[in-house]
Amino acid sequence: MFRVITCNTNGIRAAERKGFFRWLAKQRADVVCIQEIKAKEVQLTDQAFYPKGYHCFYNESDRPGYAGTAVFAKHKPQRVITRLDWDIVDSEGRYLQVDFPGLSVVSLYVPSG
C-alpha cells in the first residue's frame, strides 16, 4: 500500500520546534505533502528539514515568511513540477507536484475564502 500524508504546518520551523519531524518519523509515509512552510529553503539548513530516507522538495513563496509547499518522497520522482504559469500560485509557492510511474501527487496550498 502507498501511504500519503498531508499536513498544513503553519510554519515548518515552528512545527519542527513542536516535534513535527519526530512525529513524522513514526508515520511510515511514502509521500508527505506539506503546506504553509512559511520559509525560504536557505533558512532550512538543519538536517531535520531533510528527513533521512526522503527526497525533499521545497517550493517557497517569493514573499518571506508566507505560504509555500513541500513534498518528501521515499522514492525519487521522475519529475517535479513547481510552476503552473499562474502568477499568484507560482509566486506564492502554492503548488508542488511529484510524478511517479502511474501516479502524480500534489501538495497544494489553497487559502480559505
Locate predicted features:
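N-terminal, active-site-proximal structural segment of metallo-dependent hydrolase catalytic domains
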Residues: 1-51, 61, 66-67
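Structured beta-strand-rich core segments of catalytic domains in phosphoester-bond hydrolases
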Residues: 37-38, 45-113
